[in-house]
């Protein structure tokens, strides 16, 4: 199975059954509802949040409770922010936060950045090097490449990769849900799917730089105020 997009730099797969991860997924659902309402068909962000929550095994009951349940005072005060960071060796990092205490976020993040030997970047100076894409990993379903291309000919695709275990279909964001629906209708088993920011260019870090980034990443994963990070390291 092609794994380059699945494994890379967002929520770490080792946290798949971690309560902290589920807490962050639930928080994103609540934030999406606050902004756009409870209908995922008209709330693009909520639809993406539900899709991701299901991918990481958050139960449907928990999802529904976070959509329709009463919010508490802390939920109502959640503030979103996105920080762009320059790291060592040309590393570019985007950090998304969701917190009721922005001062705490800045204080914590400055500490992580200092240990990384990085610096805060101006808005869009890092993000310009990323592109949102829909990533769908499937089984082969007895399809060869040409047959799959014919099945998806009406949709805007970025790329299709395959190996002996399955396909990796990469779409533009607007085509993601329709492509996924088409694949499911054709009998494909979806192993993993999500919308995510993908680097347009990757950098190769030295072992020392990679160790610093791993510590930075672990700090972010363990921070309740940080929803996710992406970076352009290989």
Curated annotation (Swiss-Prot):
Location in or out of the cell: Cytoplasm
InterPro entries in the cross-refs: Integrase-like_N (IPR017856), TACO1_YebC-like_2nd/3rd_dom (IPR048300), TACO1_YebC_N (IPR049083), Transcrip_reg_TACO1-like (IPR002876), Transcrip_reg_TACO1-like_dom3 (IPR026564), YebC-like (IPR029072)
Matching Pfam families: TACO1_YebC_N, Transcrip_reg
GO MF annotations in UniProt: DNA binding
Keyword Cell membrane tagged: no
Domain of life per record: Bacteria
UniProt-recorded name of the protein: Probable transcriptional regulatory protein MYCGA1330
Species, as recorded: Mycoplasmoides gallisepticum (strain R(low / passage 15 / clone 2))
């Amino acid at each position: 199975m092609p794994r380059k997009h699945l494994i890379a730099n967002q929520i770490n797969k080792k946290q798949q059954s971690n309560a902290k991860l589920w807490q962050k997924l639930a928080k994103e659902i609540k934030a999406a509802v606050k902004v756009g309402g409870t209908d995922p068909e008209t709330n693009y962000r909520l639809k993406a949040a539900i899709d991701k929550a299901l991918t990481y095994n958050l139960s449907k009951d928990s999802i529904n409770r976070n959509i329709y349940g009463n919010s508490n005072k802390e939920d109502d005060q959640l503030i979103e922010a996105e920080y762009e960071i320059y790291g060592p060796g040309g590393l570019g990092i985007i950090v998304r936060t969701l917190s009721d205490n922005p001062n705490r976020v800045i204080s914590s993040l400055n500490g992580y950045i200092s240990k990384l030997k990085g610096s805060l970047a101006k808005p869009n100076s890092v993000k310009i090097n990323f592109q949102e894409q829909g990533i769908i990993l499937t089984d082969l379903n007895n399809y060869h490449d040409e047959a799959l291309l014919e099945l998806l000919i009406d949709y805007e695709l970025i790329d299709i990769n395959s190996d002996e275990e399955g396909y990796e279909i990469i779409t533009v964001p607007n085509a993601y849900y329709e492509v996924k629906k088409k694949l499911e209708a054709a009998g494909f088993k979806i192993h993993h799917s999500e919308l995510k920011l993908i680097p347009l260019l990757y950098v190769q870090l030295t072992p020392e730089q990679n160790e610093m980034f791993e510590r930075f990443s672990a700090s972010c994963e363990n921070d309740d105020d940080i929803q996710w990070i992406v970076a352009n390291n290989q």
